[in-house]
């Protein structure tokens, strides 16, 4: 009898827990994805803050030349970063208990791998939580689909690229200057500016900014005034009102005359789908581009593609970019190897008699 009562109480507790986790009445929705999201993001955030402030220098290139990244070791907010895990570790899973000591773990950049893996798991669960809440509220699933673009981008630079290059030391450092360093080195080694998927990403981000500004300014300029001239037009809106808050016909007419008729949407739903889909598709392509360049399927190479009748090279902008790439490659990891890979791969020229 006692065992039956205990089982019933246990079942009731589990049932109440499930109801609380999946309740849409909570101030913040938790959800089953949230059960995993909360501890992983808290872990990533906590370790990031501690390491950004106090982590000792990291031997990123595996050549016994540690690089300082934390505030207490001479950096500021701009130059500081979480230094990627050492090339000596490569792609090995490197939790604290795999190192001989905490000092060794810190020296080899263990915090970077810990932060990145927890962060990626956390943001993936955040995306799942968006879908879960949409499902419980009877909404369509496109919020999570849109969020998949930045999730894909983060996964590309923090996980796919290191896998393709063979080491977490090639991942993007977690800091402002570190991000710029990653971008410069990426251009030097992969010529990303000449990759069509990066071009699509630029069109997506800049185009999305343009379309967002156009839409916002058109709506703001065609509000249906519900207030006097002495009051803000924004005060005329009541949350949850059924009436349209702006005149889409007026906005359509204005924009159609400004450019041409069919450049303007006459369907609000199609318009907002376009506003969401354009930047999302662009960022998807960029993430795909990073993921292909991770395995050295690089940007277009038009070097020395124009020659005169005598076979002499006529430089184009592609050759100027190539010269800049070589310069950037020479500067980075200057003590890890004698020559950048492009120069080292060239066959030696015989100078004998």
From Swiss-Prot:
One Pfam family here: Photo_RC
GO BP terms: photosynthetic electron transport in photosystem II; response to herbicide
Binding site for chlorophyll a ChlzD1: 118
Positions that bind [CaMn4O5] cluster: 170, 189, 332-333, 342, 344
Localisation: Plastid, Chloroplast thylakoid membrane
N-acetylthreonine modifications at: 2
InterPro entries according to UniProt: D1/D2 (IPR055266), Photo_II_D1/D2_sf (IPR036854), Photo_RC_L/M (IPR000484), Photo_RC_L/M_CS (IPR055265), PSII_D1 (IPR005867)
Membrane topology, as annotated: Multi-pass membrane protein
Chain sites annotated for binding pheophytin a: 126
PTM text: Tyr-161 forms a radical intermediate that is referred to as redox-active TyrZ, YZ or Y-Z. C-terminally processed by CTPA; processing is essential to allow assembly of the oxygen-evolving complex and thus photosynthetic growth.
Main location as per UniProt: plastid
Positions marked as site (Tyrosine radical intermediate): 161
Gene3D superfamilies noted in UniProt: Photosystem II protein D1-like
Keyword Calcium: yes
Subunit text: PSII is composed of 1 copy each of membrane proteins PsbA, PsbB, PsbC, PsbD, PsbE, PsbF, PsbH, PsbI, PsbJ, PsbK, PsbL, PsbM, PsbT, PsbX, PsbY, PsbZ, Psb30/Ycf12, at least 3 peripheral proteins of the oxygen-evolving complex and a large number of cofactors. It forms dimeric complexes.
Additional detail: 2 of the reaction center chlorophylls (ChlD1 and ChlD2) are entirely coordinated by water. Herbicides such as atrazine, BNT, diuron or ioxynil bind in the Q(B) binding site and block subsequent electron transfer.
UniProt-listed NCBIfam families: psbA
UniProt-recorded name of the protein: Photosystem II protein D1
Organism: Pinus koraiensis
Gene name linked to the record: psbA
């Amino acid at each position: 009898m006692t065992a039956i009562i205990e089982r019933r109480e246990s079942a009731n507790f589990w049932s109440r827990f499930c109801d609380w986790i999946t309740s849409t009445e909570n101030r913040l929705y938790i959800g089953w994805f949230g059960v995993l999201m909360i501890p992983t993001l808290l872990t990533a955030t906590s370790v990031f803050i501690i390491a950004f402030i106090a982590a000792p220098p990291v031997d990123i290139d595996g050549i016994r030349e540690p690089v300082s990244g934390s505030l207490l070791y001479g950096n500021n907010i701009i130059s500081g970063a979480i230094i990627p895990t050492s090339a000596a570790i490569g792609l090995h899973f490197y939790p604290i208990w795999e190192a001989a000591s905490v000092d060794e773990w810190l020296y080899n950049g263990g915090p970077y791998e810990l932060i990145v893996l927890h962060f990626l798991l956390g943001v993936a669960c955040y995306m799942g939580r968006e879908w879960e809440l949409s499902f419980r509220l009877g909404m369509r699933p496109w919020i999570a689909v849109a969020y998949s673009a930045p999730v894909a981008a983060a996964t590309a630079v923090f996980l796919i690229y290191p896998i393709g290059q063979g080491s977490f030391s090639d991942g993007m450092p977690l800091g402002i200057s570190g991000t710029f360093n990653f971008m410069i080195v990426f251009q030097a080694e992969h010529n990303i500016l000449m990759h069509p998927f990066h071009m699509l990403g630029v069109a997506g981000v800049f185009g999305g900014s343009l379309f967002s500004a156009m839409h916002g300014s058109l709506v703001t300029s065609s509000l249906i005034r519900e207030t006097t001239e002495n009051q803000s037009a924004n005060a005329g809106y009541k949350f949850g009102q059924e009436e349209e808050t702006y005149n889409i016909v007026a906005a359509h007419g204005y924009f159609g005359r400004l450019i041409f008729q069919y450049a303007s949407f006459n369907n609000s739903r199609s318009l907002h789908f376009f506003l969401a889909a354009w930047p999302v598709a662009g960022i998807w392509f960029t993430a795909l581009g990073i993921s292909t360049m991770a395995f050295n399927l690089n940007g277009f190479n038009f070097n020395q593609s124009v020659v005169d009748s005598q076979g002499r090279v006529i430089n184009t902008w592609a050759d100027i970019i190539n010269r800049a790439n070589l310069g950037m490659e020479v500067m980075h990891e200057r003590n890890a190897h004698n020559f950048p890979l492009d120069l080292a791969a060239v066959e030696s020229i015989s100078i004998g008699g």
